[in-house]
C-alpha cells in the first residue's frame, strides 16, 4: 500500500500505547493520523479531545492495552465514548495486543473472567468492530457480539526464518500444549516437524520444563509463542532443548510483554535470537542485542483498508 488513500470518511486515530505503530499503519493505508489529544486533569483523570470533525466517518482507533494496562484501557473507553457522542458512523478498534486475555476462564473458585469484562466494557462504550492480533485465547472472540477480525503473525514470523535459510534440520517447538496449533501453522509454512514442551506450572509466572515430545537432537529449533512475559517458560524450554541435543535455539512471539526478570533471563539463556513484533511499544531498557523486531503495520493496515472497502479479510488469517 503506502499510496495516498482518497476517502475523507476514513479516519485513523492513535492513543498513547503505541503511537509509533499507529503512524506506520496510517502510512501503510496512505492517510494522516487524525488529530486528537490525551491529557490529564490535576487529579489524574483522563481528558480526550478530538480536534477534527468525525461526523459520519468510519473511525479506526489504534490502542494496545499493554502496560500500563488500566491507563491504556481507560483511554480507549473514553475515546470510544467521545467518538460515539461525536456521531462517528462506525467505531473500529485496532487492538494489536489485547490485555487481560490470560484471564479468560475461572481456573479457581471465586475468580473473575476479566477478559469477558473487558469485552463488555469495549462493546458497551460503543465500539462496532474489533481488529486484533493473536489473542492468548482465541475463544475470547466469543465474548463479543460485534464482529472480530482475529489476525495472526505466523506468516510474518515464518517468512523471517525462511529468509534466513537455517537449513533442512528445522523443528518448530510449542512451549506448551496450548500452543500446538500455532506451532503447526509455522511448521507447515517452513515444511518442518514440530516438538512440544510438556511443562507444569506450579504457580503463576513460574514454569517448570518436564519433558520434550518429539526429536530435537541435532536440530535447529524455533520456539513460537503468543506472549513472552517473564520469559520463564521460553528460557527453560530453550535450556531443555539444548540439553536434549538441539544445535541452536531461536525464539519468536507476537507480544513481547517482557516484564520483571525477562530481559536478564533471555540474555543469559541459550536463545540465539528472539524475534518479536511491534504490537507492544518497547522502551529502550527492554532492548538487547539478541532481539529483533518485525512490524505488523502492513498486516493491520491491509486489514483496515479491506474492512473499510467491505472486502474479504479471510486471506489475512492464513
UniProtKB/Swiss-Prot annotation:
* UniProt subcellular location: Cytoplasm
User: In the UniProt entry, which residues are flagged as the active site?
Assistant: 199
EC nos: 2.7.6.1
Q: Which cofactor does it need?
A: Mg(2+)
Reactions catalysed, as given in the entry:
D-ribose 5-phosphate + ATP = 5-phospho-alpha-D-ribose 1-diphosphate + AMP + H(+)
- Give the pathway annotation: Metabolic intermediate biosynthesis; 5-phospho-alpha-D-ribose 1-diphosphate biosynthesis; 5-phospho-alpha-D-ribose 1-diphosphate from D-ribose 5-phosphate (route I): step 1/1
* Keyword entries, A-Z: ATP-binding, Cytoplasm, Kinase, Magnesium, Metal-binding, Nucleotide biosynthesis, Nucleotide-binding, Transferase
Q: Name one GO cellular component term.
A: cytoplasm
Question: For binding Mg(2+) 2, which residues are annotated in this chain's numbering?
Answer: 176
List the Pfam families: Pribosyl_synth, Pribosyltran_N
Residues bound to ATP are 43-45, 102-103
Coarsely, its chief localization is: cytoplasm
* Cross-referenced CDD domains: PRTases_typeI (cd06223)
What this chain does, per the entry, is described as: Involved in the biosynthesis of the central metabolite phospho-alpha-D-ribosyl-1-pyrophosphate (PRPP) via the transfer of pyrophosphoryl group from ATP to 1-hydroxyl of ribose-5-phosphate (Rib-5-P).
PANTHER family cross-referenced by the UniProt entry: RIBOSE-PHOSPHATE DIPHOSPHOKINASE FAMILY MEMBER (PTHR10210), RIBOSE-PHOSPHATE PYROPHOSPHOKINASE 1, CHLOROPLASTIC (PTHR10210:SF41)
Q: How does it assemble?
A: Homohexamer.
Task: Kindly provide the name given to this protein in its UniProt entry.
Answer: Ribose-phosphate pyrophosphokinase
Organism encoding this protein? Listeria welshimeri
Organism lineage: Bacteria, Bacillati, Bacillota, Bacilli, Bacillales
Amino acid at each position: 500500500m503506502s499510496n495516498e488513500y482518497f476517502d475523507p470518511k476514513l479516519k485513523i486515530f492513535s492513543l498513547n500505547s503505541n503511537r509509533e505503530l499507529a503512524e506506520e499503519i496510517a502510512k501503510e493505508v496512505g492517510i494522516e493520523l487524525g488529530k486528537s489529544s490525551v491529557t490529564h486533569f490535576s487529579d489524574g483523570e483522563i481528558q480526550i479531545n478530538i480536534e477534527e470533525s468525525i461526523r459520519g466517518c468510519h473511525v479506526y482507533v489504534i490502542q494496545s492495552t499493554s502496560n500500563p494496562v488500566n491507563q491504556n484501557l481507560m483511554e480507549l473507553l473514553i475515546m470510544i465514548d467521545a467518538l460515539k457522542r461525536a456521531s462517528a458512523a462506525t467505531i473500529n478498534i485496532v487492538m494489536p495486543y489485547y490485555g487481560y486475555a490470560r484471564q479468560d476462564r475461572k481456573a479457581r473458585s471465586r475468580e473473575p473472567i476479566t477478559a469477558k469484562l473487558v469485552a463488555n466494557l469495549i462493546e458497551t462504550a460503543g465500539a462496532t468492530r474489533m481488529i486484533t492480533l493473536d489473542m492468548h485465547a482465541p475463544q475470547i472472540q466469543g465474548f463479543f457480539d460485534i464482529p472480530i477480525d482475529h489476525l495472526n503473525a505466523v506468516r510474518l514470523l515464518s517468512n523471517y526464518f525462511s529468509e534466513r535459510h537455517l537449513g533442512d534440520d528445522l523443528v518448530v517447538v510449542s512451549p506448551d500444549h496450548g500452543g500446538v496449533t500455532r506451532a503447526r501453522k509455522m511448521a507447515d509454512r517452513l515444511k518442518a516437524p514440530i516438538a512440544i514442551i510438556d511443562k507444569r506450572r506450579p504457580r503463576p509466572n513460574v514454569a517448570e520444563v518436564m519433558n520434550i515430545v518429539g526429536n530435537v537432537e541435532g536440530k535447529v529449533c524455533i520456539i513460537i509463542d503468543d506472549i513472552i512475559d517473564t520469559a520463564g517458560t521460553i528460557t527453560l524450554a530453550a535450556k531443555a532443548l539444548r540439553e536434549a541435543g538441539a544445535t541452536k535455539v531461536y525464539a519468536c512471539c507476537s507480544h513481547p510483554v517482557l516484564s520483571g526478570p525477562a530481559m536478564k533471563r533471555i540474555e543469559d539463556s541459550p536463545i540465539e535470537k528472539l524475534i518479536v513484533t511491534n504490537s507492544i511499544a518497547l522502551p529502550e531498557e527492554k532492548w538487547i542485542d539478541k532481539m529483533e523486531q518485525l512490524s505488523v503495520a502492513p498486516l493491520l493496515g491491509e486489514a483496515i483498508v479491506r474492512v473499510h472497502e467491505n472486502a474479504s479479510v479471510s486471506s489475512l488469517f492464513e
